[in-house]
Amino acid sequence: MRHKIITFILAVVVIIIIGNMIGGGGGSEATSKTSSSSKAETEKTYNIGDTVKTEKTEVTVTKVEDRDTVGTQYVEKKASEGGTIVAVQYTIKNVSKKPISSFSIPTVKLVDADGTSYDSDIDASVNYATETKVDNSKILSDLNPNIKVTGVKAFEVDKEAYAKGTWKLKFSNDVIVKIK
């Protein structure tokens, strides 16, 4: 009986270790750093309002604002103490001849001057979509050829760091847009 218990405990520990190795174990807001300065030097940076064409998409960041709250009187998200919410609106158009799977639509990260990237705040993003009347669910669907959709994201970051630093949006298709 004792051998079975020890075997069971070891199996659970091995599963946890394997899960952490596969999943990366990350739950923090700052998810990664840029690994190579030479890569950063070769990446072209665009500005708010520029339409950037890639092989499959056209991406345009249309609006960026930092706020203390996002949402409406019924659904509101306030920034944490010492934080600010960076709210972003953008469009993505499929310029290819085939539908783009929802899993292949570019994701968006906020990146500071040190290369640390930040994930969006889900609650703040939903509340900002409600406030701006943007149907964010369209970003979650397959995108057919010549169709353009609007998306919104909201990121919560340190207010002081945001006020002082240079910030960019990085799309997973390597489009980088300087926002501050």
UniProtKB/Swiss-Prot annotation:
Induction: Transcriptionally regulated by SigD. Negatively regulated by TnrA under nitrogen-limited conditions. It holds the Pfam family DUF4352. Residues 25-46 are annotated as: Disordered. Residues 29-39 have a biased composition (Low complexity). It is found in: Secreted. It comes from the Bacteria. InterPro entries: DUF4352 (IPR029051), Immunoprotect_excell_Ig-like (IPR029050). GO terms for cellular component: extracellular region. The keyword Secreted applies. Residues 1-30 form the signal peptide. Keywords: Secreted, Signal. Gene3D superfamilies: 2.60.40.1240. This is Uncharacterized protein YxkC.
